[in-house]
A protein has these predicted regions:
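Bacterial N-terminal signal peptides that target proteins for export
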Residues: 1-9
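Active-site-proximal polar cores
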Residues: 647
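Bacterial N-terminal signal peptides
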Residues: 10-18
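N-terminal lobe/hinge region of extracytoplasmic solute-binding protein
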Residues: 74-132, 298
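Glycine-rich (often Gly-Gly/Gly-Pro-rich) flexible segments and glycine-rich loop motifs
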Residues: 222-229, 241, 245, 257-261, ...
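A C-terminal, polar beta->alpha supersecondary segment
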Residues: 260, 268-283, 656-680
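Extracytoplasmic/periplasmic ligand-capture domains
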Residues: 4-5, 14, 22-25, 30, ...
Length: 680
């Protein structure tokens, strides 16, 4: 090619010489520009003339983004897991690790939260293959043979059945076990303790072991009858209490991770004896983490847990003997992971996380707040829509990050009000504990006027513009858009300082006026979550502007400490979030009205009874139109009672180095599924 270019250039020069010899001489210098296919500009003096031959510019070579270490992935987050016990962990930091170190019977078909592929089961049960009975009450799973746990022991059907039996019997209202007890033991049964005697010992780890031994054995045997292993035929059968449409989705999450019975027993867990299960009931994460059961993992998954140093890092190593030989979906991974080491670093300050990402020392980070998006955009060179396969350059195409945006999420952050603040052992979050200007009484939020005032005093528009940067959608209901029961025109509270003042002036405690006395309390959030911090600060600003004696102190707590105080009902009000476990409205109304959040908020019995009737009816109703009407009733009562200040929904954003490949979004999947990913 170079010889050809030289020949063309030479002919052009000769032609110019001939023309120059024939033409009359001119006093001025004539410049003729000829663009040819060459590699540089050449100036040639011929007969007093300069002939400039200009090369066609070569295209600028695109900047390459290559990782200095494609075998190691560094994710920088804020906050630790609560525990690694699969039966108890119920938060994203832990669940994301569990789904990498363990396997479930079935798993999501990549992005789809309602379509499933076999994992430790050899097929997904259905009516067509006989895995689901005609009445919808019996689910039979064929268990995969030849799978080994990380310690080299063999997976058996007995391990599978034991995993679910142990989970339900260990129970605990702070655990995810309600997702299994409802379909297997009966709608509305949120904890196995409710079946023991009159149910009064449910949630009480001290009282339940003292219940009648025969009654305890009866409940244990009932639970065991609901999940039965057949080691000869390599099957496990679940017997449901009533048809339950979202049963398969329930098994695909982290609490469906299959454990070794032998390892659990050796690591401080229950051994399967119905005479002793009560001694392991609702232990709490602190007790579990003092044992290998909660501080380590031992599953069949694509990664093994090398170490967890709380407050510092989690390190995962590839399972080089991972059993998968066929991809779960088209183009999916098989065998050992491509990324050999995953390091999840715990760094509270966003500025430090950002600097690590900018320097290339991190592959991705948890941002912490939508308000930090503009700073992230400064170092973003490529913008992708929904997936990493639909991308275009940004205004700064040489920058190192890739932004994946506009993908749907199934989570929300709201403000939860505590009706009966726990003062046992003292409680600094409510100051003096009295309505004296230096605190609040423990029943502060039982007053409907106080709750409505707080809802009216929150500046929703400021939150949308300053924190969500205009990208949020106001949600009038806890049920998500597109679900049965969502109402776009449902009533909701809006920012109205006049109504806030009107309501708070009606609030009294023992004849003392809240407006006259003032108050002081603490709003808690998990440290590093700047979005939740700002929510608190907005409420703080608006209330103090209304009355300088209204003091809301916004306090950050490390994630495990925050969880413990939230679960113990110590916090008078909290900013917290929920990501759905299964894509169904029941998974929203249950925790918000009678489940996890409602218990932490100590909703009064008459209110929870009213909600429970609606929630239980909605769970079993099969007619979509009738089910929607039930949830419309729920929406109105939730608005009237205002136990929670409902905020906005936001589409997702993920920032990562441009050498990262293979990430996908499944809106119910916690954490990052590194097994499908690789680095260039």
């Amino acid at each position: 090619m170079r010889n050809k270019l030289f020949l063309v250039a030479s002919l052009l020069i000769i032609a110019s010489m001939v023309l120059g010899a024939c033409a009359a001489p001119a006093p001025e210098k004539v410049v003729e520009t000829v663009t040819v296919e060459t590699v540089k500009t050449v100036e040639v003096q011929v007969g007093g003339e300069t002939v400039v031959v200009t090369a066609t510019p070569e295209p600028v070579k695109a900047k390459e983004f290559k990782s200095p270490d494609p075998t190691t992935y560094v994710q920088v987050v804020f906050g630790d897991p609560d525990t690694f016990d699969v039966a108890f962990d119920y938060e994203n930091a832990g669940l994301g690790v569990l789904l990498l170190t363990y396997d479930t019977l079935i798993f999501y078909n990549k992005e789809d939260p309602n379509d499933f592929v076999p994992q430790l089961a050899t097929e997904v049960p259905g009516l067509e293959n006989g895995g689901i009975s005609a009445d919808g009450l019996t689910f039979t799973f064929k268990i995969r043979q030849g799978v080994k746990f990380h310690d080299g022991s063999d997976l058996t059907p007995e391990d599978v059945a034991f995993t679910f039996q142990r989970g339900m019997l260990q129970g605990g209202y702070d655990s995810p076990q309600w997702l299994l007890t409802e379909p297997l033991l009966g709608v509305g049964i949120s904890d196995v303790g409710e079946l023991v005697g009159d149910g009064s010992a449910a949630g009480d780890r001290e009282a339940l072991p003292g219940m009648d031994p025969a009654e305890l054995v009866r409940v244990c045997e009932l639970v065991k009858s609901k999940v039965v292993a057949d080691n000869d035929n390599w099957t496990v059968t679940f017997q449901l209490a009533q048809p339950w449409a979202p049963f398969l989705p329930t098994l695909a999450q982290g609490w469906g991770s299959i454990q070794s019975k032998a390892w659990v027993t050796a690591s401080g867990g229950w051994d399967g004896d119905c005479a002793t299960w009560q001694n392991f009931y609702d232990p709490g994460s602190e007790a579990l983490n003092a044992l290998p059961l909660g501080s380590t993992t031992m599953g069949t998954g694509p990664y093994t847990l090398e170490r967890w140093v709380p407050g510092e890092e989690i390190v995962l190593k590839a399972n080089e003997n991972y059993w998968r030989t066929e991809p779960a979906w088209e183009g999916g991974p098989t065998g050992a992971p491509k990324i050999k080491t995953i390091i999840i670093k715990n760094v509270t300050e966003f500025s430090t996380r950002y600097a690590m990402l900018q320097a290339g020392d991190a592959d991705s980070i948890n941002v912490g707040s939508t308000a930090d998006w503009p700073q992230m955009d400064v170092i973003t060179g490529q913008i992708c829509h929904n997936t990493d396969e639909d991308c275009e350059p940004s205004e700064k195409p040489d920058e190192p990050l890739e932004l994946i945006r506009d993908y749907p999420t199934a989570n929300r952050t709201d403000i939860f009000l505590n009706f009966a603040i726990n003062t046992e052992g003292g409680n600094n979050f409510i100051g003096s504990g009295q309505l004296d200007g230096n605190g609040v009484p423990s029943n502060f939020f039982t007053n409907i006027h106080v709750r409505k005032a707080f809802a009216y005093c929150f500046n929703y528009d400021a939150y949308l513009e300053q924190v969500l940067l205009g990208e949020g959608v106001r949600s009038p209901t806890v049920i998500l858009p597109g679900m049965i029961g969502y109402q776009e025109d449902a009533p909701m509270y809006n920012y109205d300082p006049a109504k806030c003042e009107e309501e708070i002036k009606q609030a009294e405690f023992d004849g003392a006026s809240v407006w006259d006395m003032g108050f002081r309390l603490t709003l808690g959030y998990n440290t590093g979550n700047d979005q939740r911090q700002t929510i608190g600060q907005i409420l703080q600003t608006e209330l103090s502007a209304l009355n300088e004696n209204f003091v809301v102190e916004v306090t950050g707590l490390p994630w495990p400490t925050y969880l413990r105080n939230f679960r113990a009902s110590k916090l008078p009000l909290s900013t917290s979030g929920w990501i759905e476990d299964i894509d169904d409205p029941h998974n929203w109304v249950q925790p918000y009205a009678i489940g996890n959040f409602a218990r932490r908020q100590n909703l009064p019995e008459d209110v929870t009874a009213q909600f429970k009737s609606i929630v239980d009816r909605g769970a079993v109703e099969v007619d979509p139109a009738k089910r929607a009407e039930i949830y419309y009733e729920f929406n109105q009562i939730y608005y009237d009672q205002v136990p929670t200040i409902i905020l906005y929904l936001v589409n997702g954003r993920r920032y990562e180095q441009r050498w990262v490949q293979g990430w996908f979004n499944n809106r119910v999947l916690p954490g990052t599924f590194y097994y499908s990913m690789w680095k260039e």
